[in-house]
Amino acid sequence: MNEIQIRTAGIEDRAFIRSVAERTWPSTYGSIISQAQIDFMLDWMYSNDALAQQMNTGAEFYIASIKKINDQWEEVGFCSVSPEKEEGAITTTYKLNKLYVLPKAQGSGAGKALLDKAIEVAKLAGAPSMFLQVNKLNSAYTFYLKKGFIKEADFKFDIGNGFFMDDYVMRLHF
């Protein structure tokens, strides 16, 4: 088993976060959505301004590092979680906004460690659950099922420029 560290990311980590997204999205979404949509969504969600806005409006980002043979640490992925007040809800829940691990580190335990950190953050805040959106054809859907998330709904979101997100909404109750 790999030794993994999770640390809080800051504004100075935006380039790394963008880099992980740029390196994971082609293999994750390349057979699901067009390159034009990938480019649009990367600019929409991962520009310096977009990441700064997310960080400044309640989204917490975390970075996973794996210890290498030479005792050096290599950053391999990130996640983002934020409090969300759902329509009609009395309590605030949490949303897992993003969780990406570099292809070379998938299966290393980094994704599980990031998910565990996101769940810990939500539980410590007293949230009753955590939800997420995942593309219906993304293999991460199976990962989340194995971690106890249940499919709650499916939605097609118009994100502009003629593009849509065709997702499942999944939830983990604590």
Predicted features along the sequence, with ranges:
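Extreme N-terminal starter segment of soluble prokaryotic enzymes
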Residues: N2-Q5
